[in-house]
Amino acid sequence: MARGNQRELARQKNMKKTQEISKGKRKEDSLTASQRKQSSGGQKSESKMSAGPHLPLKAPRENPCFPLPAAGGSRYYLAYGSITPISAFVFVVFFSVFFPSFYEDFCCWI
């Protein structure tokens, strides 16, 4: 029963708020609807002006083929000095083709 009363009070409050907005004035900012439209229109035009020409993106100078850095933000790239998923895959496939017992032993670890 209490929730029904709470919902009814919320409906009345929202109805009152929408009526105030439709009249053109709000209590919070005391601006009329036309003043709000003008102020928001000015902000839109400023944002359009700031979205003007941008500088083109430049490719990284060192190691342009591997632009993804390793975890932790270091400057080391994935292809240099670390095991990548591709290299691990190649390692497992190579040894499983030429040494079948390696694959059976490796599957136990996974």
Curated annotation (Swiss-Prot):
Residues 1-30 have a biased composition (Basic and acidic residues). Residues 1-61 are annotated as: Disordered. Changing K16E: Inhibits SNCA binding. Changing R11A: No effect on SNCA binding. Isoform Long is predominantly expressed in heart, brain and skeletal muscle. Isoform Short and Isoform Long are expressed throughout the central nervous system, including spinal cord. Changing R11E: Decreases SNCA binding. It comes from the Eukaryota. Keywords: Cytoplasm, Nucleus. Its main location: cytoplasm. Belongs to the SERF family. Positive regulator of amyloid protein aggregation and proteotoxicity. Induces conformational changes in amyloid proteins, such as APP, HTT, and SNCA, driving them into compact formations preceding the formation of aggregates. This is Small EDRK-rich factor 1. It comes from Homo sapiens. The lineage of its organism: Eukaryota, Metazoa, Chordata, Craniata, Vertebrata.
